[in-house]
Amino acid sequence: MLLARTRLAPWTLLRSLHAIEAEHGRVRETRWGARTLDLDLVQYGVPGTPGEHVVTDPDLLLPHPRAADRAFVLEPWHLVDPEAVLRVGDAVVPVADRLEQLDRTGVRPGPDWRPTW
C-alpha cells in the first residue's frame, strides 16, 4: 500500500502504474491471470472532499470497485493510515470499520520497508 500526493491526473497515474508493471515483466493477456506485479489505483482523493475523483469508465473505475471487500487491500491501508476512509456505494466509511466486517484469514503483513537508520 502506497499513499501519495500527486499532480498527475488519475488516467496519467494509471498509465504510469501500468508502465511500472510492464518494466517488471507483467504482460496483460488474461484478465485476473497470473502476474509478476499488480499495482492498483484504489482511490484518488479523499471521499467527500473536492479532491475526490469518482470515475466510471470501463478502463478506470474509482474508487476501485472491489477494494472495500478485500481484507488484503484494507489491512495494509489501515496500517499506513489508521484514519483513512473509503467510499462504499454512497457512504463514506472508515477503513477500520469496513475491515472489521471482513474475514482476514490469511492476511499477514509484508516486510517492513521503512528505513532503519
What are these regions (language model features)?
Residues 8-117:
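Flexible, gly/pro- and Lys/Arg-enriched active-site loops
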Residues 1-5:
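Short, charge-patterned binding micro-sites
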